[in-house]
Structures are given as C-alpha cells and as structure tokens.
From Swiss-Prot:
Intracellular or extracellular location(s): Cytoplasm
One annotated GO molecular function: ATP binding
SUPFAM superfamilies: ClpP/crotonase
Pathway: Lipid metabolism; malonyl-CoA biosynthesis; malonyl-CoA from acetyl-CoA: step 1/1
Highest taxon in the source lineage: Bacteria
Record HAMAP family: AcetylCoA_CT_alpha (MF_00823)
Entry keyword Lipid metabolism: yes
Catalytic activity: N(6)-carboxybiotinyl-L-lysyl-[protein] + acetyl-CoA = N(6)-biotinyl-L-lysyl-[protein] + malonyl-CoA
Coiled-coil segments on the chain, per record: none
Stated name of the protein: Acetyl-coenzyme A carboxylase carboxyl transferase subunit alpha
Keywords: ATP-binding, Cytoplasm, Fatty acid biosynthesis, Fatty acid metabolism, Lipid biosynthesis, Lipid metabolism, Nucleotide-binding, Transferase
Subunit comment: Acetyl-CoA carboxylase is a heterohexamer composed of biotin carboxyl carrier protein (AccB), biotin carboxylase (AccC) and two subunits each of ACCase subunit alpha (AccA) and ACCase subunit beta (AccD).
Amino acid sequence: MATYLDFEQKIKEIENELEAAKARGDTAAIEIFEKDLQKEASKTYKNLSDYQKLQLARHPDRPYALDYIRLILDDAYEIHGDRCFRDDPAILCYLGYIDGQKTLVIGEQKGRGTKNKLKRNFGMPHPEGYRKALRAAKMAEKFGLPILMLIDTPGAYPGIGAEERGQSEAIARNLIEFSMLDTPTISIVIGEGGSGGALAIGVADKLAMLKYSVFSVISPEGCAAILWNDPAKVEQATKALKITAEDLKELGLIDDIIDEPFMGAHRDKEGAAKALKEYYLQNIRELMQMDPKERLEKRYEKLMKMGRFKE
C-alpha cells in the first residue's frame, strides 16, 4: 500500500478512484482518472517547496542503499568489520560488477521496520562504520577498483560510546584519506545527506544528488531549535539552509543532479536505479581514462573552491 505525504492528498484521492474504476472494469472512468492523475501530479511536483522535497528525501518507501546495490550490482560480496572494534551495519561495503565494471560500493543504510531500523541504527554510523568504509576503500585503491558511495544518513551517531571511540577523528580521517585516494570515486546523495555523517563518504571526484535528495550541515529541525527555539519553524529553516539539489548545484557544491522517476524514486525503484547506474557508468569511464595525477589535481582543485564567501 502506497504511503502518501500531506501534500499528496489530492493525488491519493484520484488514485483511489482510479483503483476503484479498474476493479469494476470501467474503461471510460479509468481513462478520465489517469488524465486527472497526470495533471494533478504534474502540478504538485512542479511547485514543490524545499520542505516538501525534504519530506520526499525522507519518504519511508524511498529506495535505500541496499535496494540500489541489489538492483545494480552483480555477484555482490559484502565486506565486514573495521578490524579495530566491530562491524557497523549502518555502513555497507560490497564488491561486485556494475554492467561488467568491477566496483566497490559503500553505502549508508537506514533500515525498514522496527527491528531492522534498530539494527542499522536508523542509518547513523558509528566510527567503526567509517573505518570499515576506509578499510574497504584502501583495498579498492590497492587493486585499482573504482568506488561508488551512496549517501543516506540523518548524521553520524552522537552517542557517548561513539564519541569515546573517536567519531570526530574517524570522520576527519576519511575526509583526508578520501581526498587523496588514488582511484576514481563517485559519491551520490540518494536521500538525506546529514552533516559530517554524509561528508565522511562524500569526498569524491564527482559528487551528485538525486533530484529529491537533500544535503545539509544540520537537520532543519535542529536549525529551527537553535536559531528560533521553535521546532514549528522547520519550513523556514529548510529554506534558509539551501539543502536541495538545485540550491547546491547553483552554489557549486555538487557536480550534477540525477533525475528521478515521475513523483519520486519511491514510485519506481527500478527506474531510479537505472538512472543512478547510467550516471555512474558514464562518469566512471571518463574518470578511469584520465591520467591519475590529473584526476587527483582536479579533485583537489574542486575541494579548494568550496567554502567561498559571497555577499
């Protein structure tokens, strides 16, 4: 059963009418409701606010990293553990083939259902998760394998244990190491890109976002609480933070925006996976043909351009 967001109620009503028409075999009504649905959905999705895009990025049916891995990666083999503490289920590392191209895929996984969400810690990695990602990345570098990273986290886990085991050090270490990694890298925000938790696997030759994903230094709820001491101002905070793919492309913080299927990736997971796969293959082949020294220089130049002040 489809999950509808608050701004999709008219769409829900039309789809319910459409299903009823299909159940009774009313061909004329089906045609009318299909046209109505197309018209209403086009109008709704053409005028989405930043907050509505945030809702889509967090949609409970939105495909997660593991969904994409299962749809695009052949002969997948999972890598476990950081060799220092434990295996963190919030970070996935898989070796496999994407259309014949050997690839390491690193992804942040939120989980579905209560048990799985708890297992994945709601997609909030511990330091051992980031260390696992770095261990796998270093192995890929050693064997000359390109890396695809899928970002989807509300943020790094801020618990006492995580801080005691060096959460900030693990994130900082990844920023350093991934900036110098001598192998082609592509990072894609597939849902939420939350602060340092996202940056830890976000330093790459190419950084892209799915159309309805978000990337931010803080959650809009956290921003509203700090600036106005009022959680009700979350919509105002969302707009002020400039967290959408369009905003970040305009600011020069991301390289590309990957289009999503009509009404979002959750409506067509296979279509979303196809678009992501095509983007990866097109760009990774270009990166692999570049001189390694030139590729690293371009990555460095891109990072150095970030954080410019503009009035």
